[in-house]
Regions:
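Helix-loop-beta hinge of the Bergerat
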Residues: 14-46
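Glycine-rich/acidic phosphate-handling loop/turn and adjacent ATP-lid/helix
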Residues: 90-117
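A conserved short beta-strand within the histidine kinase catalytic ATPase domain
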Residues: 73-81
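Glycine-rich phosphate-binding loop
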Residues: 114-129
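Short beta-strand-loop-beta element adjacent to the nucleotide/active-site pocket used for signaling
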Residues: 81-89
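Conserved short strand/loop->alpha-helix "switch" segment adjacent to the catalytic nucleotide/phosphoryl-transfer site
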Residues: 35-57, 114-116
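Short helix-loop "hinge" at the ATP-lid/N-box region of the Bergerat-fold HATPase_c
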Residues: 63-68
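Flexible, glycine-/charge-rich segments associated with ATP-binding catalytic modules
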Residues: 2-19, 126-159
């Protein structure tokens, strides 16, 4: 895993993170710590940070589990940019073309035994984001998700 931070200047918090992961499910666990560090530097609320972790866990688990037809090592690039109260989250992979926007939402009104298997993770991602865009460029999938970013409340100092 490789991690890159970029800030807006000496007086500003880091506003961007870029993480390169291998196509191995154990990499998701490593991602959580880096997102925690990013969230602290950007003063993200615990709710926003939890939802960011959940979104990326769902997306990355799907990419790692289903995108590759071989057992070779592949890189998955995750970017998160914070600006104007919004997180822009991008996941880029070189797996098989897959547009998650073409998957219909699950029918949650049907009894559990009658529902199709799968689709709940993507449904969760849709619920936690304000928009999702997909494109296929240069033999890579690009998934861009936007989410409102709440800041953590400043801690009160007792004197």
């Amino acid at each position: 895993m490789a991690i890159f931070f970029r800030g807006g200047g000496a007086s500003m918090s880091y506003q961007q993170i870029r993480i390169v992961l291998k196509n191995d499910l154990s990499e998701i666990t490593k991602l959580h710590g880096e997102l925690e560090n990013f969230g602290q530097k950007c003063s993200l609320s615990s709710k926003t940070l939890f939802e960011l972790n959940l979104i990326l866990e769902e997306v990355l688990a799907n990419v790692i589990s289903y995108a590759y037809r071989d057992n070779r090592r592949h890189e998955i690039v995750v970017r998160a940019d914070l600006g104007d109260g919004e997180l822009v989250i991008e996941v880029e992979d070189d797996g098989r073309p897959f547009n998650p926007l073409q998957i219909p939402p699950p029918d949650l009104d049907r009894p559990l035994r009658e529902r199709n298997v799968g689709g709940l993770g993507l449904h969760l991602v849709r619920e936690l984001t304000s928009s999702i865009e997909y494109s296929r460029r240069e033999e890579k999938n690009h998934l861009v998700m936007r989410k409102k970013a709440e800041k953590s409340e400043p801690r009160q100092r007792w004197t």
